[in-house]
């Protein structure tokens, strides 16, 4: 933080580290702030959560920034050269923050966003890496939230036991308080999330953040802030989620 006049200003740095041996060793931090941050912005950071590699090899991270009007906005940044250079285009929706990105079709990205308006998740899609965004039909209606981070992953039909393309989502399944941590599955591209495809993991209060990852074709893993520990890991069979 720097004191400028009578204001405390954030001098943030967006840093990247990389591993080329499956995480055994890591590079020194690489400052990519000048590549992606508009000088007029107050703040820029990633997700939180996970990034993805698109089918064409493009690396994508969800981001959030506070612009010159002091309004937060969610979007994405991407690299087409294995992380050497990074690009950021336009915000997906204003007054949004923590987001997760998934490639729902080749070249089509879905951004699922924490929305400061409260009540439900904002969802948008892009076909040009964030130059233009389109509101998804499920936005602000299909997935309730208490204004909290959430996790979203896409799993191709060939990569899971159900033989269906899946969107898997986790968050506190409520509009009040951070409780009822739930995993949900959509088999129609995020249009609907049937009750039969939902499993509640923790009904009590917690911080509510989570991160999903496939373990194998039959199992999804979730790392989340639970009511019984700072961080909890569980493995859930897809056959318990997809009916």
Language model features with spans:
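Conserved blade-ending motifs and adjacent loop-strand segments that build the rim/top face
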Residues: 140-149, 191-216
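Blade-level signature of beta-propeller repeat domains, shared across WD40, Kelch, NHL, RCC1
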Residues: 209-243
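Loop/turn-rich, solvent-exposed surfaces of beta-rich toroidal or solenoidal domains
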Residues: 121, 141-194
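Structural motif
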Residues: 11-15, 69-75, 118-124, 177-183, ...
């Amino acid at each position: 933080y720097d004191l400028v006049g009578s204001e405390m200003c954030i001098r943030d740095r967006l840093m990247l580290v990389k591993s080329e041996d499956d995480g055994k060793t890591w590079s020194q931090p690489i400052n990519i702030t000048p590549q992606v941050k508009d000088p007029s912005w107050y703040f820029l950071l990633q997700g939180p959560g996970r990034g993805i590699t698109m089918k064409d090899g493009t690396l994508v991270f969800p981001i959030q920034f506070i612009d010159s009007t002091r309004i937060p906005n969610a979007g994405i940044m991407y690299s087409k050269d294995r992380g050497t250079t990074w690009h950021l285009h336009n915000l997906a929706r204003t007054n949004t923050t923590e987001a997760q990105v998934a490639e729902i079709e080749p070249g089509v990205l879905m951004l699922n966003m924490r929305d400061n308006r409260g009540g439900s998740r904002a969802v948008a899609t892009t076909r040009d890496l964030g130059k233009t965004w389109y509101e998804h039909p499920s936005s602000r209606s299909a997935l309730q939230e208490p204004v909290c981070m959430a996790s979203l992953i896409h799993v191709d039909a060939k990569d899971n036991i159900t033989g269906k393309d899946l969107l898997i989502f986790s968050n506190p399944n409520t509009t009040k308080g951070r409780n009822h941590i739930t995993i949900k599955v959509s088999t129609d591209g995020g249009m609907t999330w049937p009750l039969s495809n939902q499993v509640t993991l923790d009904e009590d209060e917690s911080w509510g953040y989570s991160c999903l990852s496939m373990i194998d074709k039959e199992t999804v893993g979730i790392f989340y802030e639970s009511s019984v520990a700072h961080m909890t890991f569980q493995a859930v069979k897809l056959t318990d989620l997809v009916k």
